[in-house]
Amino acid sequence: MKAFIAAAAMSLMLGAPVQAEEKRGEKMVPLSPTVLSAEDVQSVAPALVRFGSEVLIDDLWQRSELLRRDRSIVTVAILIARNQPAELKQYVDVALDNAVTPVEISEIITHLAFYSGWPNAMAAVAVTKDIFAARGIRREQLASASPELLALNQAAENQRSSTVEHNFGAISPGLVKFTAQPLFLDLWQRPGLKPRDRSLVTVSALIAAGQSAQIGYHLNRAMDNGLTAQEAGEIVAHAAFYAGWPNAFSAVAVVGEVLRARGLEG
């Protein structure tokens, strides 16, 4: 039932993706849903049709606190993290219509192989390859497997690596090794996602997985790279619908701690 509700709400929502050039606050252009029709949902849960229209379409996705491009990134990340490939198909299409590039979609999947697991990433690949094929997106349009990496913030990396080594080096040397290379010295330095967006993906996936203990570090990193306090709060509001209210409330407590520490709350 839980999976059905998620799919139903998603299909209603996806009756209204938008074009990239639309301004925030404009009503979405309706499209026919491709997973569940409104009639299918009416036959089982009529209230979901109302909530899907009044709340998801006409309210949540219209809110100006977060760009639709960013909402699309958050949603795609959550669906990959929760391994929901049926819903992901529609939201990858919506993301591409909302100015998320094929390179960015590719990098989101690659990034989440590390944060949500290889099987989840492979499930996302299986869905996305058909979308790319239908849109004529070719391999040569995607980022290189081994691109020139972004410049490393050596001071921040030194602090991260020393903390990890001190806390976990004697327990799991392998984890410490792989956290440095490839995670932070390769994956995080890939240019296919801007640092702010890579952190946005990570925070969204952590919320979806209920991993609130890890959110603070990555939210601080996102805000160091340009994410605003308003956007941070809105990510949690958006995630409530796609990852569930309990996960959102677990996350909002951590977000509040980060904002207070930065003098940004209120």
How would you describe each model-predicted region?
Residues 67, 101-106, 194, 228-230:
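Helix N-cap / loop-to-helix initiation motif
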Residues 120-121, 211, 231-250:
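Preference for long, well-ordered alpha-helical segments
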Residues 7-15:
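Bacterial N-terminal signal peptides
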Residues 1-7:
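Sec-dependent signal peptide recognition
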Residues 71-79, 108-109, 198-206, 235-239:
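Short, structured motif recognition centered on aromatic/hydrophobic residues
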Residues 21-69, 82, 86-93, 97, ...:
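Acidic, glycine/proline-rich low-complexity segments that act as flexible tails and inter-domain linkers
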Residues 16-20:
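Sec/Tat signal peptide C-region and signal peptidase I cleavage site
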Residues 80, 98, 111-118, 207, ...:
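A short structural micro-motif
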